[in-house]
């Protein structure tokens, strides 16, 4: 049940971010809306959210979640462009979080750049950590043609 709940939370965060990105600028005489593009998902609590700036995301999750490590980050575009999703958890490296077995709506098959923060990040072609995979150390402005827009799950257990 926890896996279903956390997968739902990740999908909800992705949908909220995607909805914010799809909001038309300048609709009906309103000021243009800056899209939310900085998303965070904390696996241990199921907390997630998307914000229009990194400082808003840090303010929302930073102080309350010092026990959690920033494991890694993915972006929807190359060169850390587009939307960003940061994965946080208490287990750290060497652990395959079941909650990351499916990137869910909004992030599935959209990853173009990745960064392993606390440890290397592995992108998997299919959900449930199946199919072709590539492990990245540090920041990678482009995940390469073999994995670009193909990742469906993420792990932090391979070196």
For the regions a protein language model found, what residue spans apply to each?
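Compact beta-sheet-dominated domain cores in extracellular/mature segments
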Residues: 2-18, 23-159
């Amino acid at each position: 049940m926890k896996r279903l709940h956390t997968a739902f939370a990740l999908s909800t965060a992705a949908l909220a971010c995607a909805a914010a990105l799809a909001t038309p600028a300048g609709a009906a005489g309103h000021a243009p809306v800056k899209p939310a593009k900085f998303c965070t998902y904390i696996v241990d609590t199921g907390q997630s959210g998307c914000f229009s700036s990194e400082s808003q995301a840090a303010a929302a999750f930073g102080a309350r979640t010092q026990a959690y490590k920033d494991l890694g980050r993915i972006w929807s575009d190359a060169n850390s462009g587009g939307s960003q999703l940061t994965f946080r958890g208490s287990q750290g490296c060497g652990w395959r979080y079941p909650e990351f077995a499916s990137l869910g709506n909004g992030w599935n098959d959209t990853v173009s750049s990745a960064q392993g923060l606390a440890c290397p990040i592995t992108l998997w072609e299919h959900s449930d950590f199946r199919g072709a995979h590539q492990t990245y150390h540090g920041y990678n402005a482009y995940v390469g043609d073999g994995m670009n827009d193909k990742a469906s799950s993420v792990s932090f257990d391979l070196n």
